[in-house]
Structure formats: structure tokens, C-alpha cells
């Protein structure tokens, strides 16, 4: 018989820097999960990733206090900022533009994010990422 799932915990944790302090400690502690076991496993799995890169993680908590977790790709916003070397998006995205991104850069980001997106094909994924870029005040070139 399969284990009984008691809940899911969604967090964004910097790669290789999971520790028991908030937000990880309280979120896992409420479910009675072993916080240090998660931190060690997460840090071990994210060794090859750029340190400090925020990674979404979905933790599945079971009734017997065990857990499993799935690490997703970094948020599109983070990848866009990294691609065009930007610190933060525009406070007024539709009037003040903060940078430009090309279709080639968008395709690279879309390929990296493809498994986490619901897009049917690469072109749809590029349009999705382009929408995220526009909403943070980045001018998108080559995408209608």
C-alpha cells in the first residue's frame, strides 16, 4: 500500500544553502519532518548548481513523518535577470524600461524551463517567458 500523503510544502531555497532557519525550519517543523535530513539531502542534490540560485522545491510529507522532494528549475524572473545582467526589474514596467532581451536569450531560458512550463511547444514557451520579461520592464526583441 502506498504511503498516506499528509501535505505538500512549497519553498524557494537558495541552491546549496539550505539550513534550519526560516523559512525551512518552521515550514517542515509544523509537519513534524526532520529538518536537518532535508537540508543535508537538498544541499547534496544541488552541489552542481550555481550557489545561491533560488530553486523552487516541492516537499511531499507523509503520515509516517517521512518525505520526498522535487527540485524545479529556477524562476523565469531569475533567469531573465541573469541573462541580461540586471539587479531588479522596473518599479513601473510599462513606462520605465530597464533593459533588452533578444529572442535567442528567451529561447535559451525557455529550453531550460520547458519541463516546468505547461507550454505545448518551444514557441509557446518563448512567448510565456517574454510575457514575464515584459512584466518586469524589459524590452523584448523578436517576439510579437
Swiss-Prot record:
Annotated InterPro entries: Ribosomal_uL11, Ribosomal_uL11_bac-typ, Ribosomal_uL11_C, Ribosomal_uL11_C_sf, Ribosomal_uL11_CS, Ribosomal_uL11_N, Ribosomal_uL11_N_sf
Modification after translation: One or more lysine residues are methylated.
UniProt-listed CDD domains: Ribosomal_L11
Keyword presence, Ribosomal protein: yes
Cellular component aspect of the GO annotation: cytosolic large ribosomal subunit
Any Pfam family matching the protein: Ribosomal_L11_N
GO BP terms: translation
Annotated signal sequence range: none
Keyword Iron-sulfur carried by entry: no
One MF term in the entry's GO annotations: large ribosomal subunit rRNA binding
UniProt keyword annotations, A-Z: Methylation, Ribonucleoprotein, Ribosomal protein, RNA-binding, rRNA-binding
Family membership noted in the UniProt record: Belongs to the universal ribosomal protein uL11 family.
Known role: Forms part of the ribosomal stalk which helps the ribosome interact with GTP-bound translation factors.
PANTHER family: 60S RIBOSOMAL PROTEIN L12, LARGE RIBOSOMAL SUBUNIT PROTEIN UL11M
Binding partners and assembly: Part of the ribosomal stalk of the 50S ribosomal subunit. Interacts with L10 and the large rRNA to form the base of the stalk. L10 forms an elongated spine to which L12 dimers bind in a sequential fashion forming a multimeric L10(L12)X complex.
UniProt-recorded name of the protein: Large ribosomal subunit protein uL11
Gene that encodes it: rplK
Amino acid at each position: 500500500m502506498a504511503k498516506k500523503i499528509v501535505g505538500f510544502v512549497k519553498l524557494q531555497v537558495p541552491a546549496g544553502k539550505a539550513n534550519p532557519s526560516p523559512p525551512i525550519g518552521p515550514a517542515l517543523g509544523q509537519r513534524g519532518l526532520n529538518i536537518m535530513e532535508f537540508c543535508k539531502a537538498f544541499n547534496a542534490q544541488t552541489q552542481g548548481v550555481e550557489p545561491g540560485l533560488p530553486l523552487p522545491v516541492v516537499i511531499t510529507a507523509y503520515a509516517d513523518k517521512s518525505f520526498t522532494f522535487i527540485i524545479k528549475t529556477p524562476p523565469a524572473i531569475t533567469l531573465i535577470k541573469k541573462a541580461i545582467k540586471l539587479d531588479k526589474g522596473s518599479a513601473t514596467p510599462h513606462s520605465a524600461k530597464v533593459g533588452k532581451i533578444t529572442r535567442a536569450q528567451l529561447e535559451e531560458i525557455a529550453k531550460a524551463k520547458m519541463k516546468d512550463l505547461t507550454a505545448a511547444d518551444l514557441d509557446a514557451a518563448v512567448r510565456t517567458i517574454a510575457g514575464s520579461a515584459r512584466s518586469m520592464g524589459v524590452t523584448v526583441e523578436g517576439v510579437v
